[in-house]
From Swiss-Prot:
Known function: RuBisCO catalyzes two reactions: the carboxylation of D-ribulose 1,5-bisphosphate, the primary event in carbon dioxide fixation, as well as the oxidative fragmentation of the pentose substrate. Both reactions occur simultaneously and in competition at the same active site. Although the small subunit is not catalytic it is essential for maximal activity.
Keyword Magnesium tagged: no
UniProt superkingdom: Bacteria
Protein name: Ribulose bisphosphate carboxylase small subunit
PANTHER family assigned: RIBULOSE BISPHOSPHATE CARBOXYLASE SMALL CHAIN 1, CHLOROPLASTIC
Protein family per UniProt: Belongs to the RuBisCO small chain family.
Pfam families attached to this UniProt entry: RuBisCO_small
Subunit structure, interactors included: Heterohexadecamer of 8 large and 8 small subunits.
MF terms (GO), sorted A to Z: ribulose-bisphosphate carboxylase activity
Any Gene Ontology biological process: reductive pentose-phosphate cycle
Native source organism of the sequence: Rhodobacter capsulatus
């Protein structure tokens, strides 16, 4: 019989909170982030960027960074916007979203930069 591994994520400890599937993995490097952006573009999804303070990351609403990048296929432009959002909001979580036009939903959603917990 297998056992379920416990992840020590507690509301009382903001630094332990997990935000989505990728948050249980080690932080992504630039090459991994690039591959995720390429995958979003390859699927024809529209990238969007959002950010929020770590204390409010569990809430539904995050701040939108500009408008979603409808039809953007330049991976470097998307990465530049992610970096610009992070530099403008250094203490915030920054996430990348891939909007799927066909299903009218989010096809991808991942935190690219983790802010510092207070």
């Amino acid at each position: 019989m297998s056992t379920v591994q416990d992840y020590p994520s507690r509301l009382s400890r903001p630094e332990s909170r997990k935000m989505g599937t990728f948050s249980y993995l080690p932080p992504m490097g630039e090459a991994e982030i690039r591959r995720q952006v390429e995958w979003i573009v390859k699927n024809g999804w529209n990238p969007g960027i959002e950010h929020t303070e770590p204390d409010f990351a569990a809430q539904i609403y995050w701040y939108m960074w500009k408008l979603p990048m409808f039809g953007e296929t330049d991976v470097d432009a998307i990465l530049a916007e992610l970096k610009a959002c992070h530099e403008a909001n250094p203490g915030h979580h920054v996430r990348l979203i891939g909007y799927d036009n066909f299903t009218q939903s989010q096809g991808a959603n991942m935190i690219v930069y983790r802010g510092t917990a207070v």
